[in-house]
């Protein structure tokens, strides 16, 4: 579960290393975001020659959470940390590579590009 002020690692090659959630999109009273939800993030740590700079604001989709996701068969998939992939204004991934596994829950019409770039889909 991701909420405002949560820091996430970045799972793509945009140049950002760490981002902070500044808003969970989808309703004024919405507090938490799970895997597959879109959030507004601020870049807190970036590599010197990356595509993004520290302090910039982007949309991002949550791809891994420490809380995990429960499947229909009762299984629970948890990760060591929280991670997101940065998106542009058209909600397309900015990076050209995805690092680490992503879950099948991202296999919607909107995020098929992320699933196809990911090295492993759980």
Swiss-Prot record:
- Record GO biological process: translation
Keyword Transferase present in the record's keywords: the answer is no
Q: What keywords would UniProt list here?
A: Ribonucleoprotein, Ribosomal protein, RNA-binding, rRNA-binding
The record, for InterPro entries, names: Ribosomal_uL14, Ribosomal_uL14_bac-type, Ribosomal_uL14_CS, Ribosomal_uL14_sf
Query: What GO cellular component entries does it have?
Result: cytosolic large ribosomal subunit
Which GO MF terms does the UniProt record name?
A: large ribosomal subunit rRNA binding; structural constituent of ribosome
Entry's Pfam families? Ribosomal_L14
Q: Which family does it belong to?
A: Belongs to the universal ribosomal protein uL14 family.
For this protein, the record's HAMAP family field holds: Ribosomal_uL14
The cross-references to PANTHER family, in alphabetical order and at most eight, read: 50S/60S RIBOSOMAL PROTEIN L14/L23, LARGE RIBOSOMAL SUBUNIT PROTEIN UL14M
Subunit comment: Part of the 50S ribosomal subunit. Forms a cluster with proteins L3 and L19. In the 70S ribosome, L14 and L19 interact and together make contacts with the 16S rRNA in bridges B5 and B8.
What's its job?
A: Binds to 23S rRNA. Forms part of two intersubunit bridges in the 70S ribosome.
What's the protein here called? Large ribosomal subunit protein uL14
